[in-house]
Amino acid sequence: APLGLSLGKKCGRCSTRYCGPECQVQHWQEGGHDQLCKTIKKAGGAEQYNANKKYAEAVTVASEACAEDTKDQTCYICTQALHWKTKEGLVRGCSCRGTAGVVHVSCLVEQAKILVAEGEENNLDYEAMQPRWDRWTQCSLCEQSYHSVVRCALGWACWKTFVGRPEMDPTRQLALCLLGKGLSAGGHYEDALVVQEAELATGRRVGTSENANHMLTVKSNLAKTYQSLDRSEEALSLRQEVYSRTLKLHGKEHGRTLQAASNYVSSLIGLKRFQQAKKLLRKSIPAARRVLGE
């Protein structure tokens, strides 16, 4: 059942919310809450506790997966083989070659946290903040996106960092988005689906317009996850909506519209709806040529 947001039953000690008193009793008696309650409270609540736990697990998975590739090497940030505090191993999940790009997830996280905090302190606008946020997803050396288990660990790290902020805080919403994409990159599509559906529900609950770029991005990411789970009809429906709204919002020659059209065509072709795909391509290809050239 859905968790209560403000009126639901909650634990008097750690404030974990439940859908009702029966759910709370069951969790205490059978779910182990009696053993976890103090730990959850100390962590800062159920969401923070879960984020901390999942992050630690993801870092372990990433460092173990990268152990052979990073053997006898050191972190390019702290210059150590083992992290001085967490004792975690090294990872490399970008496009760096040779010995470049070897690093601790914790070092990447600290770097990203500092950059975002500095940007917020100086009230930087969206355009100036973007390169700082990129540190949660892209290598600063090769400037390519992290992938697989490393991207997944960074997604949990970002969510762990900002989960305590108010639900309407754009930073928290962006962190949730990066968590969903990180889970997808790690192949955890069912988990990504839960996160992205929650992200969409949160946007609607706080009154974000369905035509807002943020909501269109959320729906586009959700459609990609549906596609990964072989839920092609649902992916098609969302991509059709995203394309229609983006076209009205930005016009046919905007980069967002061209990308939305490409995603929509991909779904149509996947479902063998070739005539519809051909019709859309006849509209979008001339626009793409005008914007991007041959």
Show where each model-derived region lies.
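Short linker/helix segments within small regulatory modules
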Residues: 5-15, 26-32, 90, 94-99, ...
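Secreted/extracellular small peptides and ectodomain modules produced from precursors
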Residues: 35, 92-94, 229, 271
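Cysteine-rich, disulfide-stabilized extracellular repeat modules
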Residues: 7-10, 14-15, 19, 33, ...
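Cys/His-rich, Zn2+-coordinating zinc-finger modules
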Residues: 3-6, 21-49
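Intrinsic-disorder-linked linear interaction elements in eukaryotic regulatory proteins
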Residues: 43-65, 80-84, 100, 105-294
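Cys/His-coordinated zinc-finger cores
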Residues: 15-36, 99-117
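Generic structural microfeature
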Residues: 18, 32, 70-73, 102-103, ...
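Small Cys/His zinc-coordinating "RING-like" fingers
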Residues: 1-10, 18, 66-94, 141-153
